Each structure stands twice: as structure tokens, then as C-alpha cells.
């Protein structure tokens, strides 16, 4: 006790502003459930596993720790499993996470000799008792909100429900025997709550479902709400009500009244149809989900170094799939595992290592690659009975990598490709003082775009990138005859949803990866291109090639496209991807003998003409509603003149902006530096980035297009020397080599949008394919090579 009293000055009583870590070691993935428990520094409130707490004592001199140990309670192993009603984990109605219960014990430990004192104890100094009680009762800094619904969010009351006008048509809806008013469909039927029309729903992605008559009726009449027949029961909240203008499932608090208008007694109705959410749950177990996750196959669990699963933190599968592949590359393994120990990273880290990207990447690398946490758990998989591993939760890494990013720091599902690009950018910036150690460089390569003007002169635009984003030319499908026969069969037999349950019956276009690469390298016209040779606008021809070949080639398949009306759609397509590809023919050769470069410079008036101007009709309509002219112009510009409704929504959400009354300006000084930084990360020069943002009103996507369409925008980096005597890849720090690559990683996506569904990784390790599905790791017997969203290749030389 005297030893403790002599160190009281090193004990702090936590303030409300203190971040208290007590669930996970900040250096490793040890927890209170680990064999050695967890040690909380009673001065900094950081937590350490038993193997690492001495490092903290050596670094800080803090001797007093709260030791937390959790021991598992015995529980019955034959708990009945309930069928989930919500696409979620660990919440009421969702999938049971089957978490065991633990008993927690505490003691005070004084380093360096690990002298232990019991807690609670009246003999402890009051300061220590208060400090420990505060830590024990506090919510740990690591603890995040548990996993909510993967895709479905809580339904909101429709803004049209309370003011819905119903037509007195005398229509009485029978309790059964329904049929679409415009075709012979008898399932997936929707009752329009305005006029009583019964119409079929949308056509599904695979060609099944309805014939779109309900949504077409809305487009013709603008009648907003419809309820799905077959989902109406005495529990009206369970009925599936859809709002077309809000484009979502909604609640109608007056549904009973609206149904009574058509003679429907909801209390006598019985449920015969699945709701949209239930159908989504059902589809999540269908073809894509089963194929990509290899459901139904006996996957052999695999354990050991490099085979550690990642716990899903709640819609974090995009992060898990990406990081498993990233930490299968030699560059990341070398940087954060082979050549950097945990102790080395901790010694270099600031006072709070939980906020240090280098520390947390090293922690994640050692967690995934050491094999320490890849061992069979005492609990077996509830569905297969096979040994399972608990996996490691990448909470601290996610907090650091997502810091200050509105989307990645949320619990919402994200695009795995966006996350990969974000990761590469963060790692590159963190390595700016030691570029030789930057592992993200292994993904980088040079791109050169050649612009051929009708004058015969050429321009070259060079930049760096870390992905090749490929359009999918569906017209290059190799199974056109099979597709045609399939669609004729469907049309002839009228195949319904229940007739197409077998995945073998679904025929999709098969497009070779070679066709996607050829499409990328093919010539394409550029409309409204300003030619400095002709001194006017014209149509030029652009061809694209690579100036270097990276160590790791990342190919992104553009499966998500926009249909007419800016409706997102996922292409239902297979990509035939060989194990080995050769892109040698895609190397760009630069300025060729006999070619003459376009003169430098773009007139200021051309740049000014590219600046966005508010649509006068949109502005006039908003002004007539009582908004100021300036505010309306800003709303139109910031929504790219998309329409009155979009501009109105922007206005309502930005009325409190501090600069809402500032004059509209396109000056360079008003350009957001973060937007400039984003374009810099794409490999553009700063002066080009600023010109592009100025010309596009600050819109990054439009600015990128502007750069591509104006390759002569900068004298500094697009002159003769840039084409004639440009740096070699080696001189610019880019890796380079031959054009042959071997497939080693696939990130696959299941779902209708990159922002919902689920991501899974398949990785070629030690000559065999392995599936990484969050914390489930097993030998893959049928990797979905033709269903990938992002493909990772390693250069063979």
C-alpha cells in the first residue's frame, strides 16, 4: 500500500473530457478477455495488454494501472435460433450475435514489478477509489454504436400522407383475386391510394417481378402513394406503403382511413405477400449472395498467420474486404509488419497512439498477419457447427482513417473503391516525409492522354492514378445467342418470379476483361474542345495509355451506372477475368517523331465561359416563392441547375450557412483548399487544379472533366518538355516493369447499390483461394472471379 501512496501523484481522477480506454489495447487487439487481461494507465487512461504495458511504463513512467479481467460464464449451448425479421446483427429482430456473458474482476497493479492490490478495498487511498470507480463506470472510448440495419433504415411518415386527396370513383377493392389493370400479373400488385388503380410493381434486376405499370401510372398522374396488396393485415404498420416522389417505403398514419375509402376492412385481411424489406431479406439469400459467399459449400475454416478475420463493426464489410487484400501486398506487409515492430511504432507515436495512423496500421498489420488472433474460438459457428474465430475489431484503425470524413466515420455502408482511394491518399500524405517507405506507391502508375486536334497537332495530359476504372461494353458480350434465346424463352413462357429460383436459369451477359481494357484504350471524341491551334471550339480525339506499370494493378468495374433520369442501376453482368493478363500494349509512347504539339495556353474568356451560370427559370420560380435573388442563384448553381425541387432542398438546408449572403464569386481565393488537395491527389498540378475548380464552380467531378478536356491549361507541366523529356517512372518515384499480371484478389459486392448490401474478399494465398467474409475465413472452392467489383493483380516480373 505504501508503494501505491508514494505514486499517488501519477494517478488522475478522470474528467468528463477524458477519453477512457478500457475495452481494447491501443497497441494490440488484446482485451479484458485475453489471457493476461487489460491494464488501464491511471494517468493517461490508455489501455494495454499484458505483453505491452511495460512499454508504456518505459515510455511514460506511469506506474499505476487498473487491471481488468473478464472470465466467461457458463451458458447453455442449445439456445433456440429465431428467424430474423430485420437485416441487422445484434439488435431486436435481427440476427442473433449469440454473445456469451462474462464476469469482470478488477485489481490495482503497480509497475515495474506488477505488484497487485485488490479492488474494491477500503484500504485504498480515496483518490484511487474515486479514479477507479470513474473508470469502471465510464463508457469506454472504443465503444461504438453496435451494428444497426445493413441497408434498411427506419421508415418515416410520408409528407404526402396527411394531405392525400382521394378520388370518389366508387371503386371497391375485393379482399382477394387481384390482377393488374394493364396486364395479367397477379403478384407484386400495388393499390394506388388516390384513384384505387391496381397495378403491378417494378421489374426486378433479373427480369422478373412486375411490368412497371404502377410507377408508370405515377409518372402519368403524379398520384404519390401506393400500398402493396397482400401486406395489409390488422397490424397496419407492417403494411408496405411506397411514396413515389420520396422514392422510399414510408409510414401512412391515415392508412386505415385511406383503405376504408375503397371498402377495405384491414382487420379481416391476411398477409399473402412479402413486404419490400422482407423481399430484400429474401433476395439477400439468393443468387449473388449465395454465389459470392459460397453458401451451401462446405468451406473449411483456416487459421494462422494471414488468416485472421475482421469483426463487422456495423456496415464495415467494405473496410474489411479492402484491408484484407491491402495487407496481402508485399508493400504493406513490409511497411507495417515485417520491417516495423509494434514497439517501434509505439515509441514513434504521439502521446495518444490511438490517434496515430502509423501506429494503428501497424497494429492492424500485426493483428492480421501474426496469427496471434487467428485461432479456433471456444464457440463454434452456430450455423455450421465448424470451429470459428472471433476475429479482431478494427475500431481504432477505422476511427483514425475515417477522422474528419463525414461518410467513413459514420455507421453507414460505403463504397469499397472509395475507401481504397481514401486509404491510399491518407497513407501517401502520412508518408510525405519518408516517400521511400510509402507502400501506396506500389499501386501508383502514370496515365498519359493524347489529344489529337483536327489541325493535326497534338496535346498530352499526364497524371498519376492508382486504379483503372473500366466501363463495361455490354455489346461485347460473348454469349449473345444464349442471351437472346433466354429472353425469348422468358417472353414466350411468361416466367414468373417463382419459376426462376434456380441460378442456372439466369443468363447474364458475359463480357471479357480484355474488351473492357480495349475500350479504355480506344479513341473517343471530345466535344467542345478548345483548340489553341485553331483558336476555337472543335471536336478532338482522345486516346489513353499508361506511362508506367505498377507493382499492383487495381481494376475497378463500373457496374453502377445512371439510367435516364439519373436513376442508379447495377449492371447485371459477368466479367470473364483470366488468371493472367498482359497490358503491355497499353503503354503510352509519348510524343512521336513528326508530331507537333498544340500551342500553349487557354484564353481567359474560354475559362470564364466554362463557369456555371444559374438557370433563369429555376431562379425565377424560387424568387416567386419569396426567396432572395442571390440565394436562388446560389441554389441553382450548387445543384447544377438540376431543377426547382433540388434547388429548393439545397436552399432549405443551407439557409444558416455563414456565407449564404456572400456575393457569388469564382475567384481562386474562394476555392476550397480541400478540393484542391483532392485534385492534387489525382496527380494534377496545383495551378491546373485551381483553374479547373474555378472553371467548374468548385465541383470536383466537373473539375476533373475540365482538366481532361483542356490538356493545355498549364504551361508549367504540359509543355514540350513534358512530352519530350518527361521524367521516367523511376525518376518520378513510380514503380515500373513488364505488363504481365496475375490475379490475386477480388472484392465482390452483393446488393443494388455500393452504399448497401455486403462486400466479401477472395485472396489467392499460398496457391489456394481463400474467402474473407468479415470474421469468417475459409478455403474457397469456387471463387466468383466473374462477379468482382474491384480486381487486384500483381505484376509477374
Curated annotation (Swiss-Prot):
One of its GO terms (cellular component) is nucleus. Its EC number is 3.4.19.12. One of its GO terms (biological process) is leaf morphogenesis. Residues 613-654, 670-710 form the UBA domain. Keywords: Hydrolase, Metal-binding, Protease, Repeat, Thiol protease, Ubl conjugation pathway, Zinc, Zinc-finger. InterPro entries: Papain-like_cys_pep_sf, Peptidase_C19_UCH, Ub_carboxyl-term_hydrolase, UBA, UBA-like_sf, Ubiquitinyl_hydrolase, UBP13_Znf-UBP_var, USP_CS. It is an enzyme of class 3 (hydrolase). Disulfide bonds: none annotated. Zn(2+) binds at residues 180, 183, 200, 213. PANTHER family: UBIQUITIN CARBOXYL-TERMINAL HYDROLASE (PTHR21646), UBIQUITIN CARBOXYL-TERMINAL HYDROLASE 14 (PTHR21646:SF10). This is Ubiquitin carboxyl-terminal hydrolase 14. It comes from Arabidopsis thaliana (Mouse-ear cress). The gene is UBP14.
Amino acid at each position: 500500500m505504501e508503494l501505491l501512496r508514494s505514486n499517488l501523484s501519477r494517478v488522475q481522477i478522470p474528467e468528463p473530457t477524458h477519453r477512457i480506454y478500457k475495452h481494447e489495447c491501443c497497441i494490440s487487439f488484446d482485451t479484458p478477455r485475453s489471457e493476461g487481461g487489460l491494464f488501464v494507465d491511471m494517468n493517461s487512461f490508455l489501455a494495454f495488454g499484458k505483453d505491452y504495458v511495460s512499454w508504456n511504463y518505459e515510455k511514460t513512467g506511469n506506474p499505476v494501472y487498473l487491471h481488468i479481467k473478464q472470465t466467461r460464464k457458463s451458458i447453455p449451448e442449445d439456445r433456440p435460433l429465431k428467424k430474423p425479421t430485420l437485416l441487422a446483427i445484434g439488435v431486436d429482430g435481427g440476427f442473433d450475435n449469440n454473445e456469451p456473458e462474462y464476469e469482470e474482476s478488477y485489481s490495482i497493479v503497480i509497475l515495474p514489478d506488477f505488484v497487485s492490490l485488490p479492488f474494491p478495498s477500503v484500504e485504498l487511498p480515496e483518490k484511487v477509489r474515486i479514479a477507479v470507480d470513474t473508470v469502471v463506470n465510464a463508457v469506454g472510448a472504443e465503444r461504438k454504436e453496435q451494428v444497426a440495419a445493413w441497408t434498411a433504415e427506419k421508415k418515416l411518415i410520408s409528407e404526402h400522407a396527411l394531405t392525400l386527396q382521394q378520388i370518389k370513383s366508387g371503386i371497391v377493392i375485393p379482399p382477394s383475386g387481384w390482377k393488374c389493370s394493364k396486364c395479367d400479373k397477379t403478384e407484386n400488385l400495388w393499390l394506388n391510394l388516390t384513384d384505387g388503380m391496381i397495378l403491378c410493381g417494378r421489374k426486378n434486376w433479373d427480369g422478373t417481378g412486375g411490368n412497371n405499370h404502377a410507377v408508370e401510372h405515377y409518372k402519368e398522374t403524379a398520384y404519390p402513394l401506393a400500398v402493396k396488396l397482400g401486406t395489409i393485415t390488422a397490424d397496419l404498420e407492417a403494411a408496405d406503403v411506397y411514396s413515389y416522389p420520396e422514392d422510399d417505403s414510408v409510414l401512412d398514419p391515415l392508412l386505415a382511413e385511406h383503405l376504408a375509402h375503397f371498402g377495405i376492412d384491414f382487420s379481416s385481411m391476411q398477409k399473402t405477400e412479402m413486404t419490400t424489406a422482407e423481399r430484400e431479406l429474401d433476395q439477400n439469400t439468393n443468387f449473388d449472395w449465395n454465389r459470392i459467399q459460397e453458401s451451401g459449400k462446405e468451406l473449411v475454416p483456416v487459421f494462422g498467420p494471414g488468416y485472421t478475420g475482421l469483426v463487422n463493426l456495423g456496415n464495415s464489410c467494405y473496410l474489411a474486404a479492402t484491408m484484407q487484400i491491402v495487407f496481402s501486398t508485399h508493400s504493406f506487409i513490409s511497411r507495417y509488419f515485417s520491417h516495423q515492430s509494434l514497439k517501434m511504432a509505439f515509441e514513434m507515436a504521439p502521446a495518444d497512439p490511438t490517434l496515430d495512423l502509423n501506429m494503428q496500421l501497424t497494429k492492424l498489420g500485426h493483428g492480421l498477419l501474426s496469427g496471434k488472433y487467428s485461432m479456433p474460438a471456444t464457440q463454434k459457428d452456430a450455423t455450421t457447427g465448424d470451429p470459428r474465430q472471433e476475429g479482431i475489431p478494427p475500431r481504432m484503425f477505422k476511427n483514425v482513417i475515417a477522422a474528419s470524413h463525414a461518410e467513413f466515420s459514420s455507421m453507414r455502408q460505403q463504397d469499397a473503391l472509395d475507401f481504397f482511394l481514401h486509404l491510399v491518399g491518407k497513407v501517401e500524405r502520412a508518408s510525405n516525409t519518408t516517400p521511400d517507405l510509402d507502400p501506396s506507391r506500389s499501386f501508383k502508375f502514370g496515365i498519359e492522354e493524347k489529344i489529337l486536334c483536327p489541325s493535326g497537332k497534338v496535346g498530352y495530359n499526364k497524371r498519376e492514378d492508382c486504379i483503372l476504372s473500366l466501363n463495361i461494353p455490354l455489346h461485347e458480350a460473348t454469349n449473345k445467342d444464349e442471351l437472346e434465346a433466354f429472353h425469348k424463352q422468358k417472353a414466350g413462357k411468361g416466367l414468373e418470379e417463382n419459376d426462376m429460383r434456380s441460378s442456372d436459369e439466369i443468363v447474364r451477359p458475359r463480357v471479357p476483361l480484355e474488351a473492357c481494357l480495349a475500350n479504355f484504350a480506344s479513341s473517343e471524341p471530345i466535344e467542345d474542345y478548345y483548340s489553341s491551334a485553331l483558336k476555337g471550339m472543335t471536336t478532338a480525339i482522345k486516346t489513353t495509355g499508361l506511362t508506367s506499370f505498377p507493382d499492383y494493378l487495381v481494376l475497378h468495374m463500373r457496374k453502377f451506372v445512371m439510367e435516364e433520369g439519373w436513376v442508379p442501376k447495377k449492371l447485371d453482368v459477368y466479367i470473364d477475368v483470366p488468371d493472367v493478363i498482359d497490358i503491355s500494349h497499353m503503354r503510352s509512347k509519348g510524343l512521336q517523331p513528326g508530331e507537333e504539339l498544340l500551342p500553349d495556353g487557354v484564353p481567359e474568356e474560354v475559362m470564364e465561359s466554362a463557369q456555371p451560370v444559374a438557370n433563369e427559370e429555376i431562379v425565377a420560380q424560387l424568387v416567386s416563392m419569396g426567396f432572395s435573388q442571390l440565394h436562388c442563384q446560389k441554389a441553382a448553381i450548387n445543384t447544377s441547375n438540376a431543377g426547382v425541387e433540388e434547388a429548393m432542398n439545397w436552399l432549405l438546408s443551407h439557409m444558416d450557412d455563414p456565407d449564404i449572403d456572400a456575393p457569388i464569386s469564382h475567384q481562386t481565393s474562394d476555392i476550397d483548399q480541400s478540393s484542391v488537395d483532392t485534385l492534387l491527389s489525382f496527380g494534377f498540378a496545383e495551378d491546373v487544379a485551381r483553374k479547373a475548380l474555378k472553371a467548374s464552380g468548385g465541383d470536383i467531378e466537373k473539375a476533373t472533366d475540365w482538366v481532361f478536356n483542356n490538356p493545355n491549361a498549364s504551361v508549367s507541366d504540359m509543355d514540350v518538355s513534358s512530352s519530350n523529356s518527361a521524367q521516367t517512372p523511376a525518376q518520378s518515384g513510380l514503380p515500373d516493369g513488364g505488363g504481365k499480371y496475375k490475379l490475386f484478389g477480388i472484392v465482390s459486392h452483393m446488393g443494388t447499390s455500393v452504399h448497401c448490401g455486403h462486400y466479401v474478399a477472395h485472396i489467392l494465398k499460398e496457391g489456394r483461394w481463400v474467402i474473407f467474409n468479415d470474421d469468417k475465413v475459409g478455403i474457397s472452392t469456387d471463387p466468383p472471379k466473374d462477379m468482382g467489383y474491384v480486381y487486384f493483380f500483381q505484376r509477374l516480373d
